[in-house]
């Protein structure tokens, strides 16, 4: 459920969020079928909006949370879900890599998670600070899957889902 507003206590402390507000017009006014959101208050409030989080930006500005911090860093993350042959599956196995096939001038890494039902999640994240205009993160992901250890896991399997998104890397 998306959150549309941050709630502050009288003393200025972060108190909660408004969630589940639906039916606003493009200009922000209530439209036909408008449903107000529900206030959710908590002792702790976690904002997990991703790289374009408008509520997080508001909170960062209000409390000056970016003072003395590095500039934000971003990456592009790609993930595929595979159904693999049982003999290629090891439920619970986790593999993280870094570097290859990107080379020394670029940074990124991969993950391979063996979940239940012969499902394997394969993902690759490339930092968006690369200088080579010809670097194509999607093709680097394809190269990664041809590594002998990864290809062996995926051999005879079937990709059943995929996606990509921008990810925060620090800052």
Language model segments and positions:
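A glycine-rich dinucleotide-binding beta-alpha-beta segment and adjacent secondary-structure elements
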Residues: 153-171
């Amino acid at each position: 459920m998306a959150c549309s507003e941050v709630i502050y206590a009288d003393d200025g402390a972060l108190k909660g969020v408004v969630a589940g507000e639906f039916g606003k017009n493009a200009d922000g006014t209530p439209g036909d079928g408008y449903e107000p959101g529900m206030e959710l208050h908590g002792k702790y409030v976690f904002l997990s909006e991703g790289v374009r989080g408008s509520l997080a930006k508001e909170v960062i500005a209000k409390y000056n949370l970016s003072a003395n911090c590095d500039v934000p860093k971003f990456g592009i993350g790609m993930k595929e879900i595979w159904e693999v042959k049982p003999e290629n599956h090891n439920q619970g196995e986790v593999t993280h890599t870094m570097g290859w096939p990107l080379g020394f001038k670029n940074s990124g890494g991969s993950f391979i998670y063996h979940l239940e039902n012969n499902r394997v999640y394969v993902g690759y994240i490339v930092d968006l600070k690369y200088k080579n205009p010809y670097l194509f993160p999607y093709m680097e992901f394809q190269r990664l899957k041809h590594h002998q250890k990864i290809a062996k896991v995926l051999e005879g399997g079937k990709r059943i889902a995929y996606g990509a998104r921008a990810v925060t890397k620090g800052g």
